[in-house]
């Protein structure tokens, strides 16, 4: 399977963006204080771009991590979008695109989307899957003050993945995905995710694995966690990003312009598909992509 770098269909655009998108004018509607009230899907999705053979990524995330592989979208032009279910979220994969920077490696080596965390009830099952898939067994450490275990591994493209074993936890935790962002300025980034995106801010926590504090924000079964290791790290703006499904993307466009948020790809419509989109950058250039689908639009109209 060969993956390309441009998207030509609805759900693929959620991941990639597309030059075929046509600008649309924003209608005058009531102002919103943040994107929070417009979030329709009770989770967020995440995407990662890669340079290795796609089968290597599929083996790691499917066979070893145990994520359910969903239909891969063939969007034409030799372009495909691979999708995996992680609880109520989707993790999506595509080839790298130009005009973005890529810095594989550890969580503290660059700003950007640096870590994905998945939660499991049973250590032995995880180890068995890794070994059966031909990988070394993850090395788990105790999480101080809890009954949990944690292991840090790297996917075939050099991206960090944390595996947390949490026995006897509520099912909601096993449906949760934690998206770890390394940022250059915690105060600025916290304000962005709290005040612009409108996520629920959780109390800060000590993070013994990375010897720092982490600041987390929650929406449904997705947690966005911020860490900082200084202001002088190189910026990885291409490896990954976050996608939100909203009821009114035009309101997001107006809010972004009002707040001075960087717009990477402007408010657009994919002709032939019930999809309107806008791509924004957070203060470190990490993609925050907002999509209004036919389903979310109909849900808003029915209210």
Predicted regions and their residues:
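Short hydrophobic/aromatic beta-strand micro-patches
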Residues: 49, 117-119, 180-182, 243-245
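Ordered, small/hydrophobic-rich secondary-structure cores
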Residues: 35-50, 56-143
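Core segments of cupin and vicinal oxygen chelate
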Residues: 47-91, 148, 180-223
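Helix N-cap motif at beta-to-alpha junctions
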Residues: 53-54, 120-124, 185-186, 246-249
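Bacterial N-terminal signal peptides that target proteins for export
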Residues: 1-11
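Vicinal oxygen chelate
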Residues: 26-39, 127-175, 180-181, 204, ...
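A short, acidic/glycine-rich surface segment
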Residues: 30-32, 99-104, 226-227, 298-299
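Bacterial N-terminal signal peptides
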Residues: 9-20
């Amino acid at each position: 399977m060969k993956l390309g770098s441009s998207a030509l269909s609805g759900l693929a655009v959620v991941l990639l963006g597309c030059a075929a998108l046509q600008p649309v004018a924003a209608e005058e509607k009531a102002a919103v204080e943040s994107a929070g009230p417009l979030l329709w899907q009770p989770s967020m999705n995440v995407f990662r771009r890669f340079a290795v053979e796609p089968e290597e990524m599929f083996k790691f995330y499917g066979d070893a991590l145990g994520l359910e592989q969903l239909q891969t979208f063939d969007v034409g032009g030799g372009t495909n979008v691979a999708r995996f279910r992680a609880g109520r979220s989707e993790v999506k994969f595509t080839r790298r695109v130009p005009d973005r920077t890529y810095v594989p490696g550890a969580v503290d080596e660059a700003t950007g989307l640096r870590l994905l965390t998945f939660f499991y009830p049973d250590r032995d099952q995880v180890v068995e899957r890794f070994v059966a898939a031909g990988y070394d067994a993850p090395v788990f450490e105790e999480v101080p003050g809890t009954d949990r275990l944690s292991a840090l591994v790297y996917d075939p493209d050099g991206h960090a993945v944390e595996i947390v074993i949490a026995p006897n936890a509520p099912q909601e935790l096993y449906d949760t995905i934690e998206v770890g962002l390394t940022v250059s300025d915690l105060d600025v980034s916290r304000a962005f995710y709290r005040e612009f995106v409108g996520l629920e801010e959780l109390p800060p926590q000590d993070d013994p694995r990375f010897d720092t504090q982490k600041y987390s924000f929650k929406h449904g079964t997705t947690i966005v966690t911020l860490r900082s290791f200084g202001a002088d790290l190189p910026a990885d703006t291409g490896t990954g990003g976050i996608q939100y499904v909203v009821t009114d993307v035009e309101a997001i466009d107006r809010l972004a312009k009002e707040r001075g948020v960087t717009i990477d790809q402007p408010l657009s419509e994919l002709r032939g598909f019930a999809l309107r989109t806008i791509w924004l950058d957070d203060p470190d250039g990490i993609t925050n992509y907002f999509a209004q689908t036919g389903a979310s639009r109909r849900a808003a109209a029915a209210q």
